Design a protein with these regions (language model features):
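Basic, helix-initiating cap at the start of DNA-binding domains
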Residues: 1-21, 25-34
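Short hydrophobic clusters on alpha-helical segments that form packing/core surfaces
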Residues: 10-18, 61, 65, 90
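HTH DNA-binding helix-turn interface
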Residues: 20-23, 43-54
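Key DNA-contact positions within bacterial/archaeal DNA-binding proteins
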Residues: 40
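Hydrophobic alpha-helical connector segments
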Residues: 56, 70-96, 148
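Amphipathic alpha-helical packing segments from all-alpha helical-bundle domains
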Residues: 66, 111-149
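Amphipathic alpha-helical segments used for helix-helix packing
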Residues: 85, 91-120
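Amphipathic C-terminal alpha-helical segment
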Residues: 92-96, 151-168, 181-190
């Protein structure tokens, strides 16, 4: 491994290779060449090869996403405002993600699987880890977990199948959409 070469540089190279050739076609050799490391170095850093490397890339992307999301929501002191901020920011981040757009265009089946069936449990786990401290002041632990699960599924669903009438990237539209659900939750907690 050359001076300054790191796991991050290899993950960056993997991301570029995926954008260029698609997940199914990219090889360890492609990633090693793009990152300037040998196959041996790549395997030493990512034992298990391509699957382990792609898993590390997904974890990094999720971590960066939720770092940005929690930074945007920091300081919000009202539950409704928090939910709106989380939904709007997440929707805007997903829409602005060029890598995601490229991958959806070139390998929609693979990406849909990672956003839904295969990758959704991981996304919900990471979301719960990051968002619970923000949501917990307003809800019980169990309610927080369920609310985060719902928010993740809702946001991904509307990202993948946008509505003609609801824009979750718009604060006013998102607020109008979630208010009835939050009102029902508040009533259920009172009774």
């Amino acid at each position: 491994m050359g001076p300054g070469t790191s796991e991050a540089q290899i993950l960056d190279a993997a991301k570029r290779c995926c954008e260029r050739w698609g997940v199914a076609k990219v090889t360890i050799d492609d990633i090693a060449t793009a990152s300037g490391v040998s196959r041996a170095t790549l395997y030493r850093l990512f034992p298990g090869g391509k699957d382990v490397l792609f898993s590390a890339l997904q974890v990094r992307e999720l971590t960066e996403f939720f770092d940005r999301l929690t930074a945007e929501a920091a300081g919000v002191d009202d539950f409704e405002d928090l939910v709106v901020r989380l939904i709007v920011t997440a929707t805007r981040e997903l829409r602005a993600d060029e890598h995601l757009a490229i991958m959806l265009g070139s390998e929609p089946g693979e990406v849909l699987g990672q956003l839904t069936v295969e990758g959704l449990p991981r996304t919900i786990r990471v979301a719960t880890e990051y968002l619970t401290p923000l949501v917990r002041p307003y809800l019980t632990e169990n309610e927080s977990t369920m609310a985060i699960d719902l928010l993740v599924r809702l946001t991904i669903s509307y990202f993948l199948a946008p509505s003609d009438t609801i824009d979750l990237g718009d604060p006013v539209s998102a607020r109008q959409f979630i208010q009835p659900g939050l009102a029902a939750l508040a009533c259920a907690r009172i009774t």
